[in-house]
């Protein structure tokens, strides 16, 4: 006789009530650090033409552009190392401590880029020092986005995780807007000659005060409820084992959660390739290939990004209602179908059509960024969440980070301005496969954590849904048992000796 496993019901005491004040602080601190990360990426992408002339003088303009963007891409090689390092520490000692460390390293390394003398002053050491600073950034960023997304996800109520998580990439886009705006403002005030001489350094100097503010906010945060629950469980069951912190098993990650790892890699590749193509490569594409002035190209991208800021939280809010998968599928299909039309518009040399083409790509990007920060942390349980997510995220970013360099090389080598569109179509297929195979995570507790609600009333509603789900599961199991027993009866009738 098949036996049914008893399901232990939860009570109101098992539901975590999230404090609104702590949630707002967590979102602000996480988003600010993420904004600073993308502020640097935005600045670097928008001043790539200047950096090419400062650190790679004497080379052909095309070579200068590719070399500057290659320096942008090389640090992605070290990001997986940073991800593994900070991920392991984050699962062992907590999320808050690691986020404080990453923002310090990131702000100092960004600030130091502004201090590097030009190639004319110190020769080959100029690009070498630039590369060292970028690699330090890459190491810290390896634990930044994953840690920030986990921090927000573990602080968010289950029914609002999509909306709350969307503010993390709101910070990313805002960082790009700030970086681009600073570049345009400074270059306009000081003129192109002075900007190439010393003005390009100012945006990098701004990173230090931003880092100090971010450190202050993150230092004041408490550990997330989900991680604290995990520590409490370990403390109750294994006080001796807790002395060295919770254990992280990479064997468990690779063998038990390989499907989640692949899903994470696919989603991040689809999102970040589109991200880097639109927000990092397009300014250079507009200026170098379409012969727009640098400021003109940047202003177009700034306008697009400001529009994205308004769409971003709407996507997160809608994902709490309709789920995360529909947005991944919609974004992937739209990217595949509209990549070529978008670049036909961009290459039209008509300002209105260029804007329309970029806007198409921006809305598609919002489909991905609106759900990514809430989707990724839900794929793994608390005790391995940081390590697993950091490993998968940074491996995929290693691929996505090559986008500006690869796109520039493809265009230069083929003399075909449609190559970026073909590249995006390939990435769209990756996103589509990911969307089809991924599991829905909206409105569900994080793995390894109790349900989380924003107030008592919502907690009671969660309990009602929980009991309804249990009753449905019990009915489903009863039907399965009945079907199995019927199959057993038929087999016994066909082979009577089996039941002897």
UniProtKB/Swiss-Prot annotation:
<feature type="topological domain" description="Periplasmic">
    <location>
        <begin position="282"/>
        <end position="297"/>
    </location>
</feature>
<feature type="transmembrane region" description="Helical; Name=7">
    <location>
        <begin position="261"/>
        <end position="281"/>
    </location>
</feature>
<feature type="topological domain" description="Periplasmic">
    <location>
        <begin position="347"/>
        <end position="350"/>
    </location>
</feature>
<feature type="topological domain" description="Cytoplasmic">
    <location>
        <begin position="216"/>
        <end position="260"/>
    </location>
</feature>
<feature type="topological domain" description="Cytoplasmic">
    <location>
        <begin position="1"/>
        <end position="37"/>
    </location>
</feature>
<feature type="transmembrane region" description="Helical; Name=10">
    <location>
        <begin position="351"/>
        <end position="371"/>
    </location>
</feature>
<dbReference type="InterPro" id="IPR036259">
    <property type="entry name" value="MFS_trans_sf"/>
</dbReference>
<keyword id="KW-0997">Cell inner membrane</keyword>
<feature type="topological domain" description="Periplasmic">
    <location>
        <begin position="59"/>
        <end position="65"/>
    </location>
</feature>
<feature type="transmembrane region" description="Helical; Name=12">
    <location>
        <begin position="417"/>
        <end position="437"/>
    </location>
</feature>
<feature type="topological domain" description="Periplasmic">
    <location>
        <begin position="119"/>
        <end position="121"/>
    </location>
</feature>
<feature type="transmembrane region" description="Helical; Name=9">
    <location>
        <begin position="326"/>
        <end position="346"/>
    </location>
</feature>
<comment type="function">
    <text>Proton symporter that senses osmotic shifts and responds by importing osmolytes such as proline, glycine betaine, stachydrine, pipecolic acid, ectoine and taurine. It is both an osmosensor and an osmoregulator which is available to participate early in the bacterial osmoregulatory response.</text>
</comment>
<feature type="transmembrane region" description="Helical; Name=1">
    <location>
        <begin position="38"/>
        <end position="58"/>
    </location>
</feature>
<feature type="topological domain" description="Cytoplasmic">
    <location>
        <begin position="438"/>
        <end position="500"/>
    </location>
</feature>
<feature type="topological domain" description="Cytoplasmic">
    <location>
        <begin position="143"/>
        <end position="169"/>
    </location>
</feature>
<dbReference type="InterPro" id="IPR005828">
    <property type="entry name" value="MFS_sugar_transport-like"/>
</dbReference>
<dbReference type="GO" id="GO:0007231">
    <property type="term" value="P:osmosensory signaling pathway"/>
</dbReference>
<feature type="coiled-coil region">
    <location>
        <begin position="453"/>
        <end position="498"/>
    </location>
</feature>
<dbReference type="GO" id="GO:0006865">
    <property type="term" value="P:amino acid transport"/>
</dbReference>
<keyword id="KW-0175">Coiled coil</keyword>
<comment type="similarity">
    <text>Belongs to the major facilitator superfamily. Metabolite:H+ Symporter (MHS) family (TC 2.A.1.6) family.</text>
</comment>
<dbReference type="InterPro" id="IPR005829">
    <property type="entry name" value="Sugar_transporter_CS"/>
</dbReference>
<feature type="transmembrane region" description="Helical; Name=4">
    <location>
        <begin position="122"/>
        <end position="142"/>
    </location>
</feature>
<feature type="topological domain" description="Periplasmic">
    <location>
        <begin position="412"/>
        <end position="416"/>
    </location>
</feature>
<feature type="topological domain" description="Cytoplasmic">
    <location>
        <begin position="372"/>
        <end position="390"/>
    </location>
</feature>
<feature type="topological domain" description="Periplasmic">
    <location>
        <begin position="191"/>
        <end position="194"/>
    </location>
</feature>
<dbReference type="GO" id="GO:0031460">
    <property type="term" value="P:glycine betaine transport"/>
</dbReference>
<feature type="transmembrane region" description="Helical; Name=2">
    <location>
        <begin position="66"/>
        <end position="86"/>
    </location>
</feature>
<feature type="transmembrane region" description="Helical; Name=6">
    <location>
        <begin position="195"/>
        <end position="215"/>
    </location>
</feature>
<keyword id="KW-1003">Cell membrane</keyword>
<dbReference type="InterPro" id="IPR015041">
    <property type="entry name" value="Osmo_CC"/>
</dbReference>
<feature type="topological domain" description="Cytoplasmic">
    <location>
        <begin position="87"/>
        <end position="97"/>
    </location>
</feature>
<keyword id="KW-0472">Membrane</keyword>
<dbReference type="Pfam" id="PF00083">
    <property type="entry name" value="Sugar_tr"/>
</dbReference>
<feature type="transmembrane region" description="Helical; Name=3">
    <location>
        <begin position="98"/>
        <end position="118"/>
    </location>
</feature>
<dbReference type="GO" id="GO:0005886">
    <property type="term" value="C:plasma membrane"/>
</dbReference>
<feature type="topological domain" description="Cytoplasmic">
    <location>
        <begin position="319"/>
        <end position="325"/>
    </location>
</feature>
<protein>
    <recommendedName>
        <fullName>Proline/betaine transporter</fullName>
    </recommendedName>
</protein>
<dbReference type="GO" id="GO:1905647">
    <property type="term" value="P:proline import across plasma membrane"/>
</dbReference>
<keyword id="KW-0769">Symport</keyword>
<dbReference type="InterPro" id="IPR051084">
    <property type="entry name" value="H+-coupled_symporters"/>
</dbReference>
């Amino acid at each position: 006789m098949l036996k049914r496993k008893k399901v232990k019901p939860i009570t109101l005491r098992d539901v975590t009530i999230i404090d609104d004040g702590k949630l707002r602080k967590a979102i602000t601190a996480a988003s600010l650090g993420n904004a600073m990360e993308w502020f640097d990426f935005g600045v670097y992408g928008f001043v790539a033409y200047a950096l090419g002339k400062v650190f790679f003088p004497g080379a052909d303009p095309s070579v200068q552009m590719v070399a500057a963007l290659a320096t942008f891409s090389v640090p992605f090689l070290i990001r997986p190392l940073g991800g593994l390092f900070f991920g392991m520490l984050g699962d062992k000692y907590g999320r808050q401590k690691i986020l404080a460390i990453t923002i310090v390293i990131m702000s100092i390394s960004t600030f130091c880029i502004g201090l590097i003398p030009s190639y004319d002053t110190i020769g080959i050491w100029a690009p070498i020092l630039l590369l060292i600073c970028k690699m330090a950034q890459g190491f810290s960023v390896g634990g930044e986005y994953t840690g920030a997304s986990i921090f927000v996800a573990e602080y968010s109520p289950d029914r609002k995780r999509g909306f709350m998580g969307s503010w993390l990439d709101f910070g990313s886009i805002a960082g790009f807007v700030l970086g681009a705006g600073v570049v345009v403002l400074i270059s306009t005030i000081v003129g192109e000659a002075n900007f190439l001489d010393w003005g390009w350094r100012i945006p990098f100097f701004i990173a230090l005060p931003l880092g100090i503010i971010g450190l202050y906010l993150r230092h004041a945060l408490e550990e997330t409820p989900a991680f604290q629950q995990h520590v409490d469980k370990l403390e109750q069951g294994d006080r001796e084992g807790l002395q060295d912190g919770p254990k992280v098993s990479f064997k468990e990650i690779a063998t038990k959660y390989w499907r989640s790892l692949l899903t994470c890699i696919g989603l991040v590749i689809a999102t970040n390739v589109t991200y880097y193509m639109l927000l990092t490569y397009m300014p250079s594409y507009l200026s170098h290939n379409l012969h727009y002035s640098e400021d003109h190209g940047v202003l177009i991208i700034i306008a697009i990004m400001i529009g994205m800021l308004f769409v971003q939280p709407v996507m997160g809010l809608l994902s709490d209602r309709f789920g995360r998968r529909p947005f991944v599928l919609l974004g992937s299909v739209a990217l595949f179908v509209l990549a070529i039309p978008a670049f036909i518009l961009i290459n039209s040399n008509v300002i209105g059509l260029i804007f329309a083409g970029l806007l198409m790509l921006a809305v598609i990007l919002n489909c991905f960024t609106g759900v990514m920060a809430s989707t990724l942390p839900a794929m793994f349980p608390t005790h391995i969440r940081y390590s697993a997510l950091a490993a998968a995220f940074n491996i995929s970013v290693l691929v996505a980070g090559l986008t500006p360099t690869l796109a520039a090389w493809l265009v230069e080598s083929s003399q075909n301005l449609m190559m970026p569109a073909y590249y995006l179509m390939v990435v769209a297929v990756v996103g589509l496969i990911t969307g089809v195979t991924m599991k829905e995570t909206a409105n569900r507790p994080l793995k390894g954590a109790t349900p989380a609600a924003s107030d008592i009333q919502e907690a009671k509603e969660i309990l009602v849904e929980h009991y309804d789900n249990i009753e449905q599961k019990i009915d489903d199991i009863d039907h399965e048992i009945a079907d199995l027993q019927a199959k057993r009866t038929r087999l016994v009738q066909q082979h009577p000796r089996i039941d002897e």
